[in-house]
Amino acid sequence: MTTLSPQISPALSIVHPITLDHGKNAHVWDTAGKQYIDFVCGIGVLNLGHCHPNVVNAIVQQAQKMTHYAFNAAPHQPYSLLMDALADFIPTQQPLVGMLTNSGAEATENALKVARFNTKRSAVIAFDGAFHGRTLAALNLNGKVAPYKVGLGALPGPVFHIPFPSPDTGVSAQTAIAALQRLGEVEIGFDEVAAIIVEPVQGDGGFQVLDAEFAQYLRQFCDQHGILLILDEIQSGFGRTGKRFAFEHLGIEPDLLLLGKSIAGGMPLGAMMAKAELFKTMPKGSLGGTYSGNPVACAAALEIIKLLSDAPTLEKWATDYENRVQQHYQQWQQQGLSIVGRLTGIGAMRGIELRHPDGRPGTAELAQILNQAREKGLLLMPSGSSRHIIRLLAPLTIEADTLDHGLRILGDCLANC
């Protein structure tokens, strides 16, 4: 057990009671010197691993030139260079424009402002199992009450939730379409809805992929009703699914796009990108932030984009990762491990569901596996509505033998349930 400062709020939940000291690619070491294979990576922040040398070099070089300047006071070059790079990197028919933020949650908040200002509407439709942040407006979008919304009273809204259709959940496109239509008949007129926000692959919800048929219906539905479609790629973006962004798998494009996590290789940064016309009439000063677009974080992000811009390399990373996970999953099935449910997700964004033969989620078993795996030198992260799905978030750059070693540890823990 680690000893934490008593000045740290107990409202911060900690999955692994250890204190980390340093990391390299897919490994971390705690202050006692114990080494771990890292299948968490800051919860999807390190798609290219801990301390990638190119990223570290970019950070050092920029820190020696300028550590910070508030962009609203006087622009700095890394911000501008990064916005150009993002516009080229994001695969949309027309380049998106936008702003940099400190985090994904802040990107969500600013997207809501843009949507409400442009549509002159206030309602938002989100999805069961969604996670969009812990700030006040963002957390009301989350498709789960505990622990995010408990005891907070009325939250900014109105927000309405419908089922998330996915081959991973068993919820069909038709079921979600019917729920959406019912919403318009019973709860709120669609002419009052500013935006629909959705993750192409749910993160905290359990790495569940949005049904492609529904995604295309949703794009048409939003166009028909003057509703803005916000795609949250905070966790699924920057190569995690084998493409630059997960929306490429779905055959749609967003009106607004939320970015964060792996955008800057561990530096705090997010972005809210959108179609250019959405900013034309917004008041000067309505967007911004003191630390938003910090130059050191921008320098790191520029290097990340360079490293992820080669499509064949990116696809190979994700395919190799996916194939190894599938091979181990098939072995677990062949061994008759009854607690092992579905393999969720796509590319290198994969989840292992734990479920009993009678249908009960394996919440207690997952908690047990987290502890057992850590003792054996593997860090894992829970997800899912019942905390019954193991998130596999190793770096795309993980060595093959390290990935196999980690999956063998996981298999041993599954066999002990």
Where are these predicted regions, by residue range?
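Conserved N-terminal phosphate-binding loop of PLP-dependent enzymes in the Aspartate aminotransferase
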Residues: 1-417
